[in-house]
Amino acid sequence: MSDGEQAKSRRRRGRRRGRRAAATAENHMDAQPAGDATPTPATAKRSRSRSPRRGSTRMRTVHETSAGGLVIDGIDGPRDAQVAALIGRVDRRGRLLWSLPKGHIELGETAEQTAIREVAEETGIRGSVLAALGRIDYWFVTDGRRVHKTVHHYLMRFLGGELSDEDLEVAEVAWVPIRELPSRLAYADERRLAEVADELIDKLQSDGPAALPPLPPSSPRRRPQTHSRARHADDSAPGQHNGPGPGP
C-alpha cells in the first residue's frame, strides 16, 4: 500500500471513531437521571420546545382612592379626657379589628367631603376637618385584579351625634381614650397616623388653629371608581404596604 493510500485509510478510521464518540456522548446525555443532574442548555432547550405555551393573560391593575378621619371629642380640653371614634370589623378568623372610619371617594366629592360623610355613615357622628394626617398606600388582590388603594386621613373635631353601628359593614363602634390608640388600632400605618394626630393636638392647644398645617389641595372626583374590599382574613400582618390593608 502506498503512503497516500495509508493516509486515506487513517483519515477514514478517524472519522468513524469521531462518529462513534459523538453518538456515545449523545447517549450519555439523554440517559442522565432527571432528578440528579442539572439539565444542560441543550436538554433545557428541548424541554422548553416540547412544553405547551401558557396563556399571556395579565392581571388588571386598578387604582382606588378613599378618605377617612380620626374624630376627637374634647379636642380642646384636657388630654386625659380626649376620646377618639373607632370602628370594629370582624374578619373570617373571628378577630375584631379596630380601625379608623373611611370609605371610597364618590363622584363629585373632595377627599375632605368623603371623610366627613364616611365618618357619619359608619359611626353616626358628625365631624369637621382640622388638618391632614397623611395618606396610606397599599396593594391587594381581589376578584382577579390587583388593586392599588390610596387612603387620605384627616384629624377631625367632634361636632355632635350619637355613636351608632347601623352600617352593615361595621360590627362595633366605640369611643376610645386617645392614649389607648397605639394598643387598639390593628394596623401599624394607622397607629403612626395617631402619633401624628397627637403632635397636631399639642400644636392646636398651645398655639391655636393657625399653628396647624394648611390642608393640601383636593379636587372633586370627576370619574367613578371601582369599589373593592381587602380581605382581612388573609391579613396575617396588619399594616403591611403590600397586602390587605385597613378596609375600604
From Swiss-Prot:
The entry marks the following residues as binding Mg(2+), namely 103, 118, 121-122
Q: What happens when the gene is disrupted?
A: None observed.
Q: Which UniProt keywords apply?
A: Hydrolase, Magnesium, Manganese, Metal-binding, Mutator protein
Composition bias of kind Basic residues appears in 9-20, 45-57, 220-230
Q: Where is this region: Disordered?
A: 1-64, 204-248
Which parts of the sequence belong to the Nudix hydrolase domain?
62-198
Q: Does the keyword Cytoplasm apply?
A: no
A molecular function (GO) held by this record is: hydrolase activity
Q: Where is this motif: Nudix box?
A: 103-124
Q: What is its EC number?
A: 3.6.1.-
Q: Which Pfam families match?
A: NUDIX
Q: Which cofactor does it need?
A: Mg(2+); Mn(2+)
Ranges of Low complexity compositional bias? Answer: 31-44
Q: What induces it?
A: A possible member of the dormancy regulon. Induced in response to reduced oxygen tension (hypoxia). It is hoped that this regulon will give insight into the latent, or dormant phase of infection.
- Cited PANTHER family: ADP-RIBOSE PYROPHOSPHATASE, DIHYDRONEOPTERIN TRIPHOSPHATE DIPHOSPHATASE
Family the entry assigns: Belongs to the Nudix hydrolase family.
User: What's the further remark here?
Assistant: There are 4 mutT paralogs in M.tuberculosis; the exact function of each is unknown.
State what this protein does. May be involved in the GO system responsible for removing an oxidatively damaged form of guanine (7,8-dihydro-8-oxoguanine, 8-oxo-dGTP) from DNA and the nucleotide pool. In vitro has dATPase rather than 8-oxo-dGTPase activity.
What is the official name of this protein in its record?
Putative mutator protein MutT4
